[in-house]
Swiss-Prot record:
Name the record gives this protein: Glutenin, low molecular weight subunit 1D1
Tissue: Expressed in endosperm, but not in husk and leaf tissues.
Protein family (similarity comment): Belongs to the gliadin/glutenin family.
Lineage: Eukaryota, Viridiplantae, Streptophyta, Embryophyta, Tracheophyta
GO MF term list: nutrient reservoir activity
Feature: compositional bias, Low complexity: 43-88
Length: 307
């Protein structure tokens, strides 16, 4: 135990001695009250001189470096001038906006197109009906009765002059009967006033066309009215009554006046011109001709001129 205590004391003494030696050798480890002002504080005024020289040498060089920089900044404005490409988008958007308002006028053009196309169609029908009515001759029934022999003569194609095939609807009469019809026609035609002869001959041709139309319609209706034979037969009196009922409205329409089709108007003009060449020459009668002032639709001729 004594030896241990002795070693401990020696160790403590050694450590204290070592600590004192270190504090004496190293000035920073001294106690604050034992520290003395360091002499190197006098070197501080020399540093500003060195720093001023460095500043005088470095700062004048910096302006030269800054003078080199303006070209770099001057190069940027053109780059900034290239940026106005972005504001070019508004005019592009304006063009798009201008294109869109062009659609309403296009839709406005489409809407008015339909009414004008529908309105002229009934107007054309009305004009066609008015022109046809103007071409239908208006003659007293008594005059038509007087010229009935002329009508039969033309309808039966008794004249040697070539007539349209549509006039020859029945068998040709004998030469004697044709001669009789010719004499009767030439007796009645001079009795008609001279100013009414043209319209009278035109009315004869018009009545022939209506008779042909009536015959065609009657044949079509008779074919439609014939019942299909499916084990049932319809009596003849019933068929006759049906035909009579079907013919009555036709006769009423013909009596009131039937509108001619475009091809019938052309037929009326052609047949009238042929009749005006035959009858005056055959009967030695003067028939004054008048040119119609109204134009016929669908490319049909404008009436018969004076010969």
């Amino acid at each position: 135990m004594k030896t241990f205590l002795v070693f401990a004391l020696l160790a403590v003494a050694a450590t204290s001695a070592i600590a004192q030696m270190e504090t004496r050798c190293i000035p920073g480890l001294e106690r604050p009250w034992q520290q003395q002002p360091l002499p190197p504080q006098q070197t501080f005024p020399q540093q500003p001189l060195f720093s001023q020289q460095q500043q005088q040498q470095l700062f004048p060089q910096q302006p030269s470096f800054s003078q080199q920089q303006p070209p770099f900044w001057q190069q940027q404005p053109p780059f900034s001038q290239q940026q106005p490409i972005l504001p070019q988008q508004p005019p592009f958007s304006q063009q798009q906006q201008l294109v869109l308002p062009q659609q309403p006028p296009f839709s406005q053009q489409q809407q008015p197109v339909l009414p004008p196309q529908q309105s002229p169609f009934p107007q054309q029908q009305q004009q066609h009906q008015q022109l046809v009515q103007q071409q239908i001759p208006v003659v007293q029934p008594s005059i038509l009765q007087q010229l009935n022999p002329c009508k039969v003569f033309l309808q039966q194609q008794c004249s040697p002059v070539a007539m349209p095939q549509r006039l020859a609807r029945s068998q040709m009469l004998q030469q004697s009967s044709c001669h009789v019809m010719q004499q009767q026609c030439c007796q009645q035609l001079p009795q008609i006033p001279q100013q009414s002869r043209y319209e009278a001959i035109r009315a004869i041709i018009y009545s022939i066309i209506l008779q042909e139309q009536q015959q065609v319609q009657g044949s079509i209706q008779s074919q439609q009215q014939q019942p299909q034979q499916l084990g049932q037969c319809v009596s003849q009196p019933q068929q006759q009554s049906q035909q009579q009922l079907g013919q009555q409205p036709q006769q009423q329409q013909l009596a009131q006046g039937t509108f001619l089709q475009p091809h019938q108007i052309a037929q009326l003009e052609v047949m009238t011109s042929i009749a005006l060449r035959i009858l005056p020459t055959m009967c030695s009668v003067n028939v004054p001709l008048y040119r119609t002032t109204t134009s016929v639709p669908f490319g049909v001729g404008t009436g018969v001129g004076a010969y």
